[in-house]
Amino acid sequence: MEPIIANPRACLGTGLVVAAAVLVIWLVTAGADGFGLVSFLVRFLHVLAAMVWVGLIVFVNFIQLVALRAADDQGREFLHKAIVPNVAWWFRHASTVAVLSGALLLLLAGYLAPSLVYGTGVYMPPPRVWLVWLGVIGALAMWMFVHMYIWPNMQVVLGIRPGDDAAKAQARNRVITFARLNLIFAVPVTFAMVAAAHLY
């Protein structure tokens, strides 16, 4: 057990193995439905990626930015080398996986081209459709914040792209602004997506 606990990747792998075992038990007891299984696995991937993405939005706004503001130059340099690049990597890739899996899920659920999936039109209650598309538009805006504003400016802050002190200060302010916007959007987007599936 200790080798697993000592390695976060081993912990994640163990969790995935346990989840796979639960899925196998379900398939044995309930039977297999190929299309339903694919839809579920895409949804599961989408939820996992969204959890990481929103979790990191909370981390960046309430922990990372606060720590960077409070740290001295030496502490800030350490955070920029050891923490911020890793957070940015997970942030970017989780957002992309969430958006791509979400797009695939829209197709599988019949919100996009239902006749291609089901062979006929699929009725979706208008309130549910509006909630889903509200979430989609908000999520795409959040993804754009990450890849078009936060990451390019973060590269200047981290010294990956050239910039003098004034450019770094301006880039830092832009990162904070769009990180805050991501936090604002995260709550209604999550609400809309969950409500579309579960709000009676």
Predicted features and spans:
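Polytopic transmembrane helical bundles with strong interfacial aromatic enrichment
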Residues: 1-200
